[in-house]
Regions:
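Core segments of cupin and vicinal oxygen chelate
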Residues: 10-62
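A generic structural signal for ordered alpha-helices
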Residues: 6, 23-24, 74
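Vicinal oxygen chelate
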Residues: 1-4, 9-10, 13-16, 33-34, 41-44, 62-99, ...
Length: 99
């Protein structure tokens, strides 16, 4: 049984916009904001009331981070009134939310 979560990842289309939203609008704290020699940016934030939870804001691959067919499936479910869809990719469950 999982009783506590210490790390999770959000794939974001723009890390600067994600920073603006999570830090400046929601009041999250920045844990790490470092750019590696290869240009990869490692950006993690923590909710103000959960200092033990670290969220990695990963840059999404491509235009939005999802393959076209996955987006079609998600849109189909959203059109049916589903707010989020759990998709299982290999052994990993990913919760996709779109508004």
């Amino acid at each position: 049984m999982i009783t506590k979560l210490s790390h999770t990842s959000f794939f974001v289309s723009d890390q600067n916009k994600a920073y603006e939203f999570y830090v400046n609008k929601l009041g999250f704290k920045v844990n790490t904001d470092a750019t590696m020699e290869n240009g990869f940016r490692w950006l993690t934030v923590t909710p103000p009331d959960q200092p033990d939870l670290e969220i990695v804001l990963f840059p999404a691959a491509g235009s939005n981070g999802f393959e076209e067919e996955v987006n079609k499936a998600l849109n189909f479910l959203l059109e049916k009134g589903v707010m989020g869809a759990a998709l299982f990719i290999l052994w990993t469950a990913v919760l996709l939310m779109k508004n």
